[in-house]
Amino acid sequence: MDEKTIEKIKKEAEEIINKFSEVLEKFNLEMEESYYIIDTRNVLREDEAVESNPEFREKFLKIAPKVNKEGYVVVEKGSWLK
């Protein structure tokens, strides 16, 4: 690259950094850290353990295309994961 092009790139990079700095100055960084973006979470129900229905499990496993020896349904790997 010639000197003129290098100087142009430097000038443009400096302008970008300055503009970025101006935008950052507008953010309120004095707020409390939080994990969730909104205060409400899981508003539909409480998480709780549910008893399984052995009869349902037995019927489900009978109609499943493939079940391993531990009694879990074996599913095909997604074609997008090749």
Swiss-Prot record:
It catalyses: L-glutamyl-tRNA(Gln) + L-glutamine + ATP + H2O = L-glutaminyl-tRNA(Gln) + L-glutamate + ADP + phosphate + H(+); L-aspartyl-tRNA(Asn) + L-glutamine + ATP + H2O = L-asparaginyl-tRNA(Asn) + L-glutamate + ADP + phosphate + 2 H(+). The keyword Disulfide bond does not apply. GO terms for molecular function: asparaginyl-tRNA synthase (glutamine-hydrolyzing) activity; ATP binding; glutaminyl-tRNA synthase (glutamine-hydrolyzing) activity. Its EC number is 6.3.5.-. One of its GO terms (biological process) is regulation of translational fidelity. The keyword Nucleotide-binding applies. Transmembrane segments: none annotated. Heterotrimer of A, B and C subunits. NCBIfam families: gatC_rel, PRK00034.3-1. Allows the formation of correctly charged Asn-tRNA(Asn) or Gln-tRNA(Gln) through the transamidation of misacylated Asp-tRNA(Asn) or Glu-tRNA(Gln) in organisms which lack either or both of asparaginyl-tRNA or glutaminyl-tRNA synthetases. The reaction takes place in the presence of glutamine and ATP through an activated phospho-Asp-tRNA(Asn) or phospho-Glu-tRNA(Gln). Belongs to the GatC family. This is Probable glutamyl-tRNA(Gln) amidotransferase subunit C. It comes from Methanocaldococcus jannaschii (strain ATCC 43067 / DSM 2661 / JAL-1 / JCM 10045 / NBRC 100440) (Methanococcus jannaschii). The lineage of its organism: Archaea, Methanobacteriati, Methanobacteriota, Methanomada group, Methanococci.
